């Protein structure tokens, strides 16, 4: 990867920085129980790991052949987020090497930010619990600008707050929603292949595929 001209690195959160799969499945199961349904079976795999909370839960209901509650999809997402907020911090660990690599990037003078479909308050809580919130200048949640990825708006919103143009940034993510967001925003995309994404990501342009931050070359850029 040639880091020339890169002034900012923006990261998706779930499946890119934090392995939140266990916490997400647990919160989804608790939401089903709240609705009067059976909990999810052990080792359940979420049918959707890249949308908003409401999207995730709607797809769980569909996969389990359960009806949408009368309160609607938006309320369903809020119930999920309530249960997710109760999960213990250790339920969403950092991927190996994340903190050291982020710190190295900061030491090179790069601006760092997070752009996630998680609610902003939950994103702040998760990053703080993981001990990396202090490394980011901007954290954008799905409620920060009124629209979620794969729309380009959240990423452009993030870069606007960093005062960095799209051509001078790289977006790190794990799903095709991240890749589509980057493409629409005119931002280079780096794919974390060990996250929650599928081969759908291969349909989008990428400057880097990597599975481990510990093997990722450290940025050594000279900023103009």
Task: Identify the meaning behind each predicted range.
Residues 1-9, 103-106, 119-120, 124-224:
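Asp-based, Mg2+/Mn2+-dependent phosphohydrolase catalytic module
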Residues 2-100, 106-108, 121:
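N-terminal helical cap/lid subdomain that shapes the substrate entry/recognition surface
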Residues 17, 46, 112-115, 147, ...:
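Conserved SAM-binding loop
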Residues 17, 89-90, 111-112, 143, ...:
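A generic structural signal for short
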Residues 22, 116, 125:
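Conserved catalytic-core motifs of eukaryotic protein kinase domains, centered on the activation segment
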Residues 38, 111, 188:
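Residue-level detector of anion-binding/catalytic polar loops
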Residues 93-98, 111-116, 132:
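Hydrophobic, well-structured mid-protein blocks that either form specific transmembrane helices
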